[in-house]
Design a protein with these regions (language model features):
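Glycine/tyrosine- and acidic-biased, solvent-exposed loop/turn segments at the edges of beta-strands
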Residues: 1-257
Length: 257
């Protein structure tokens, strides 16, 4: 069959539209027995090209299809009025996109296999914002958390919690280098330059919290954070104000909001 036609299947599904050599090919409408409906392009008996897929619960997708799957760019609106616009792969949100929840939350960034994974920005209706790494739908890795009042935390996260080391800055207060364990604050060190125990790395001043100082120089084992709050060292070894052993790790830089 070639041209316009109608097809009815034993399982209750049906198609009405263009055919080419007996296959759905061109523009048409396909309906399933469960009341899903697809309207759009077909190629070689498959949904392929631009189209609209509607579910009986009110969900709707408008965008690209490839070999029967949502692949390419598109817009998905849920029955709850959540909206996603961006890239899809094999029926999943995958790649760059933006998701807006009906409660006002918004995420813009990378998705993988249907969840937030990679770099992104999450904003709450309160005005608070997180910018950084995500893994399997959770804040995980390096990031910066911005509060509406101007407070920032730049550091490590795990499973949506502050976890590891970071710098918290409150307006009109001294920045504080902190250690967290799954949302619980373990220790904190104000970042204040002092002549009592000096430390310089790459000609920049650092704050040292360690075992001892000799002649005003950082000496022994301990942790250190740069005065600008952009880097830190854990389990370092220092001799008379110099780093002998330990890795310098960068912290994300907060930008003006």
């Amino acid at each position: 069959m070639t041209g316009q036609g109608r097809l009815e299947r034993r399982d209750g599904a049906g198609y009405e539209g263009d055919f080419l050599d007996g296959q759905m090919h061109g523009k048409g409408t396909y309906s399933w027995a469960d009341r899903r409906v697809y309207q759009g392009a077909f190629r070689n008996d498959k949904r392929h090209g631009s189209g609209t897929l509607r579910w009986p619960n009110g969900n709707q997708y408008v965008g690209d299809f490839l070999d029967n799957r949502r692949t390419g760019t598109g817009r998905f609106v849920s029955a709850e009025n959540d909206v996603y616009e961006g890239e899809f792969l094999n029926d999943q949100m995958h790649g760059n996109g933006a998701y807006v929840w009906s409660d006002g939350r918004r995420y813009e960034g990378l998705f993988r296999d249907g969840v937030k994974s990679g770099m992104g920005v999450l904003t709450w209706p309160t005005g608070n914002t997180y910018e950084g790494q995500f893994l399997e739908d959770q804040r995980h890795g390096l990031g910066v958390l911005y509060w509406r009042d101007g407070t920032t935390y730049q550091g490590l996260f795990a499973l949506n919690q502050m976890n590891g080391y970071g710098v918290k800055t409150i307006p009109n207060e001294v920045p504080v280098f902190q250690q967290w364990r799954m949302g619980d604050l373990l220790e904190a060190w104000p970042i204040v330059e002092s002549d009592r125990c000096r430390l310089n790395i790459d000609d920049a001043p650092w704050i040292f919290a360690g075992s001892s100082c000799i002649n005003g120089q950082a000496h022994g084992s301990g942790i250190a954070v740069s005065v600008d709050g952009q880097a830190y060292i854990v389990n370092g070894r220092f001799v008379l104000g110099r780093l002998i052993q330990g890795d310098v790790k960068a912290l994300p830089s907060p930008e003006s909001q």
